[in-house]
Amino acid sequence: MHGPKATLQDIVLHLEPQNEIPVDLLCHEQLSDSEEENDEIDGVNHQHLPARRAEPQRHTMLCMCCKCEARIKLVVESSADDLRAFQQLFLNTLSFVCPWCASQQ
């Protein structure tokens, strides 16, 4: 750098590869022509096995009280499909009431 401010000519980077050996980035893997897809680990054809139930996961939802509009944090544990069915109830008539409004009734 020459002077108090840097100029573009002062900040020129010369990038060069660290190794001179060229690296082949192509994948030379060949897939088998078998019609059945086998699992790599156990060799079992999973297409004919019954479907496993999805593992439940924890989901956090922020809802509003239908009376005072206070925020309510709801935590459920379910599969993604069951959670989707639960969310469909919100589109109909299902509403939540906060503990304070529930105690006032």
UniProtKB/Swiss-Prot annotation:
Record GO cellular component, one term: host cell nucleus
InterPro entries (UniProt xref): Papilloma_E7
Gene: E7
Protein's cellular compartments: Host cytoplasm; Host nucleus
Originating organism: Human papillomavirus type 18
One GO term (biological process): DNA-templated transcription
Zinc-finger ranges (unnamed): 65-101
Protein name: Protein E7
Molecular function in Gene Ontology: DNA binding; DNA-binding transcription factor activity; protein domain specific binding; zinc ion binding
Pfam families reported in the protein's UniProt record: E7
Subunit structure, interactors included: Homodimer. Homooligomer. Interacts with host RB1; this interaction induces dissociation of RB1-E2F1 complex thereby disrupting RB1 activity. Interacts with host EP300; this interaction represses EP300 transcriptional activity. Interacts with protein E2; this interaction inhibits E7 oncogenic activity. Interacts with host TMEM173/STING; this interaction impairs the ability of TMEM173/STING to sense cytosolic DNA and promote the production of type I interferon (IFN-alpha and IFN-beta).
Keyword Electron transport included in the entry's annotation: no
Annotated segments matching region E7 terminal domain: 1-49
Motif segment (LXCXE motif): 25-29
Family: Belongs to the papillomaviridae E7 protein family.
Known role: Plays a role in viral genome replication by driving entry of quiescent cells into the cell cycle. Stimulation of progression from G1 to S phase allows the virus to efficiently use the cellular DNA replicating machinery to achieve viral genome replication. E7 protein has both transforming and trans-activating activities. Induces the disassembly of the E2F1 transcription factor from RB1, with subsequent transcriptional activation of E2F1-regulated S-phase genes. Interferes with host histone deacetylation mediated by HDAC1 and HDAC2, leading to transcription activation.
Signal sequence residues: none
PTM text: Highly phosphorylated.
Nuclear export signal (motif): residue ranges: 83-91
Record note on domains: The E7 terminal domain is an intrinsically disordered domain, whose flexibility and conformational transitions confer target adaptability to the oncoprotein. It allows adaptation to a variety of protein targets and exposes the PEST degradation sequence that regulates its turnover in the cell.
Keyword vocabulary terms for this entry: Activator, DNA-binding, Early protein, G1/S host cell cycle checkpoint dysregulation by virus, Host cytoplasm, Host nucleus, Host-virus interaction, Inhibition of host innate immune response by virus, Inhibition of host interferon signaling pathway by virus, Interferon antiviral system evasion, Metal-binding, Modulation of host cell cycle by virus, Oncogene, Transcription, Transcription regulation, Viral immunoevasion, Zinc, Zinc-finger
